[in-house]
Amino acid sequence: MAEEDIQPIVCDNGTGMVKAGFAGDDAPRAVFPSIVGRPRHTGVMVGMGQKDAYVGDEAQSKRGILTLKYPIEHGIVNNWDDMEKIWHHTFYNELRVAPEEHPVLLTEAPMNPKANREKMTQIMFETFNCPAMYVAIQAVLSLYASGRTTGIVLDSGDGVSHTVPIYEGFTLPHAILRLDLAGRDLTDNLMKILTERGYSFTTTAEREIVRDIKEKLAYVALDYEQELDTARSSSSIEKSYELPDGQVITIGAERFRCPEVLFQPSFIGMEAPGIHEATYNSIMKCDVDIRKDLYGNVVLSGGSTMFPGIGDRMSKEITALAPGSMKIKVVAPPERKYSVWIGGSILASLSTFQQMWISKAEYDESGPGIVHMKCF
């Protein structure tokens, strides 16, 4: 097989979802939950060909008989056996490729511990025998996907949010802020406020329903107090949602109360800055000369930035914090749910990137530490 025919694989491992596909494509081929499920009661059904572990959608659909585990918490891998299962499933079942034939680009959370990057590298070369691999920082890929090399990325997924300032393609590690507030917390918050309305959602299965309600109906208010007044005085913002059993529920103020937590974490008892303030704090930790470039390029990325109205609200809030004359631009690309993956697809297919891969030979010579020399 000629060198040119080999498409690199791009795999973005998020806390909630794995996004995987081939470099050069404009969207991931496989998107599935980052879950590994193991049977709670083994050996009940002899001869049923029960597997010892299920991954992704299959684990989700059989969740009644399984114990579900998320190997990635707050963006960082903490269970390598399960993570290996997820990668195995990605290559062999979802993409149906032999990993020993393709270079693999993986993504990592900002400030991922050094030992973790080494472990990822080791698994790719030793377990999957990849010919080459690379580890890229998620936020940087999102910035590339938006066609920029300088800006500040607010990346908010299911398990963690980060504000990452990037200048000429390099992250500024001292100014990165992590906020353990993301999609899962918003879903939990919506479960709680729906309970106040008299609807009860408690199990993990019901959490998935609430997540769907959140994704379909929630939005960010430009002015929270004013929106509350509107909600009290009229039914204009009420929407109905049909549950799987056919029951129809109505939700009003909950629609914008749910994601308001991103701006006011105190709503769920968190002592943390909102995403607007974290973005501002991140910018203020950077050199005074580059702040103007960051204010003018605030890029939203990740599934938890998909709420309608979030861009305008971010713009309003950052404008209120920034110096008066500062020009502020918040960019919310329509494909931002997958922009990390898309950035990886762009990067891995660049001709200039081809000398950046860590090859199997380099790994064999230097060991896992090679990742710190070649991946920034």
Curated annotation (Swiss-Prot):
One of its GO terms (cellular component) is cytoplasm. It comes from Oryza sativa subsp. japonica (Rice). It is an enzyme of class 3 (hydrolase). It is found in: Cytoplasm, Cytoskeleton. PROSITE patterns: ACTINS_1, ACTINS_2, ACTINS_ACT_LIKE. Pfam families: Actin. The keyword Ribosomal protein does not apply. It catalyses: ATP + H2O = ADP + phosphate + H(+). Its main location: cytoplasm. Keywords: ATP-binding, Cytoplasm, Cytoskeleton, Hydrolase, Nucleotide-binding. One of its GO terms (molecular function) is hydrolase activity. InterPro entries: Actin (IPR004000), Actin/actin-like_CS (IPR020902), Actin_CS (IPR004001), ATPase_NBD (IPR043129). There are at least eight actin genes in rice. Its EC number is 3.6.4.-. This is Actin-7. The gene is ACT7. Actins are highly conserved proteins that are involved in various types of cell motility and are ubiquitously expressed in all eukaryotic cells. Essential component of cell cytoskeleton; plays an important role in cytoplasmic streaming, cell shape determination, cell division, organelle movement and extension growth. Belongs to the actin family.
